[in-house]
Amino acid sequence: MVPEDVTTQWAQAFWDAGYQLHAHTNGDGSAARLIKLIKTLQANTPKPDHRLSLEHFAYTTEDQNRQLKELGAVVSANPYYHFILSDIYSEQWLGADRGNQMVRLGSLERLGVPFAFHSDSPMAPLEPLTLVSAAVNRVTINGNLTGEHERVSLDAGLRAITINAAWVMGYEDEIGSIRAGKKADFTILEADPYKVSPKRIKDIKIWGTVFEGTPAPLSAN
């Protein structure tokens, strides 16, 4: 582990040089350390739109989420980890109170903290709709509904793999939504996510993609 003072020194150097910072945080201990770091960076060199992001976001407290909102932080989360790990973490390692509350995305949505999803491949599958399904349903691999109040709306889930994902990386003017002047890069689904059962979101088939305006149907491969 890098000593805290060294981390702060490096972070301050990149912060002052204009880089966007991304930090891996899996527990509330690392989240607390990152919150402290953001406060230091903002005190030394205030930035209204820094978009410092927490990557993974496995476990935080409600109070920490409120602090992230106040500090202007953003989140790149992996809700798949709740799907695959919540049960075993609850039973064997963290206890039900923490295991059930993994990846508190509902809290972020209520607070208005911007968030996106990532796969963390090869640790988890490259399946954006699986991430949406995990966040919207919060049903574990064993079929248990845990942390129901941390579910997110379908709209928030879809934004997390499109425009919000682009925004977190600073590419919202190029990709992430269909608009004149942006790159025509998007995926075409065979069913409307808003018209299927939430439990079926992960099963929606992919027709193909459009890359820079050129359609590429999967059937052609």
Region roles according to the model:
Residues S219-N221:
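Extracellular/periplasmic ectodomains of large secreted or surface enzymes and adhesion receptors
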Residues V74:
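Ligand-binding beta-strand-loop-alpha-helix segment within the catalytic cores
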Residues Q12-H22, G29-L52, H56-F57, E62-R66, ...:
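His/Asp/Glu-enriched, well-ordered alpha-helical/loop segment
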Residues M1-V6, F57:
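Active-site gating/metal-coordination segments in enzymes
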